[in-house]
Amino acid sequence: MTYSPTQSPLVTRRAFCGGLTAAGMMAALPVSRAFAQAAYPERNFRVIIPTGQGGGAERLARAFDDAWSKLLKRQFEYTFHPGAAGQIGYELFVKQREADGHNLLFGNMGPEMIMYAVQKPNYRFPEDFIYFGRTDIDDSCVFVRNDSPYKDIKSVVEAAKKKPLNVAVSRIPHPASIGMLALGEATGSSYNLIPYGGGNPTYVAVMNGEADIGALPITGVLSLTSQFKVLGVFNKENIFAGITENAPTINSAFGSSIPDLYSSRAWAIHAKWADANPENFALLQSTAEQAHASPEFRDGFVKTGSPVESLKFGDRQVCTEYANAMIELAKRYEPVLSAQR
């Protein structure tokens, strides 16, 4: 059969009917199967970080996405929305970002679940969003600048029995803030918590003497050991004793029974998308776990000055259990947290 280049090629009846049959089969398939070959993710990810730029969350997220972006073959684009102890960023994520699997949040589950319990914002966990990729476990600690007059945690408590000490914290609803309030209750000492909206400005406040002491997650402090000294840790064990001059646990120093207080950062996504797209969500979670185990991420994390021992991956179930535990802890300390606001 021949035809002119200016004419349409002839189509046989068999080919035409076959084409209709194939089209009909595609139309009959569920959308998820009909477009199974459409690659997810289809574009870059947009990430909200609900704290200020330049802090520990940003450093950790960027080190992580160096490995994750290669697995997903997409880049990560960040915006920073501090304020109201993280509430502003979460409300923006839940209410204004499309639940399409390409919008993520990278948050600090500990303080942000405490904020959720205390401030009672207009969104719901886990109905509106879920955490699925925990990156680390970060114990809360008390620290000072290296030339501080306070050389150990007992000297801090003795001074705070005479007058309230100013404590720089990243935010009031935070495990480290609960630790300071619980320390005050246990020892009869007094602390004035001053929130600075993120780790970086908190370090600056301690460094320039605006605050007497600081209380933050330990890994960021350990990345700045040339400037700061850890005095005590809110956990049953100080796993970094060798690089903190054997700083004691708070409970061992005072015979108290303060619960373990640690933060865990994690990726979050809209719950309705995750539940409606189980295969794509499984891809997101499995590649997150692969990225976490990769030498590239661990090398990048170490380059931030943070100790690799704190890296511990957690899936959706692990994250949900931790988040719910933080909500219960916040309810226990809600009266004193509310009094500090």
Which role fits each region the language model picked out?
Residues 1-11, 15, 19-28:
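N-terminal secretory signal peptides
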Residues 34-47, 97-102, 157-165, 303, ...:
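Immediate post-signal peptide segment of exported/extracytoplasmic ligand-binding proteins
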Residues 35-127, 172, 176, 189-215, ...:
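N-terminal (or domain-start) structured segment
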Residues 42-44, 279-341:
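An extracytoplasmic/periplasmic, membrane-proximal ligand-sensing/linker region
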Residues 68, 95-101, 116-201, 266-299:
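Hinge/capping helix and adjacent helix->loop/strand transition within the periplasmic-binding protein
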Residues 109-111, 137, 147, 219, ...:
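Solvent-exposed coil/turn segments that connect beta secondary-structure elements
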Residues 220-293, 340:
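C-terminal lobe and pocket-closing loops
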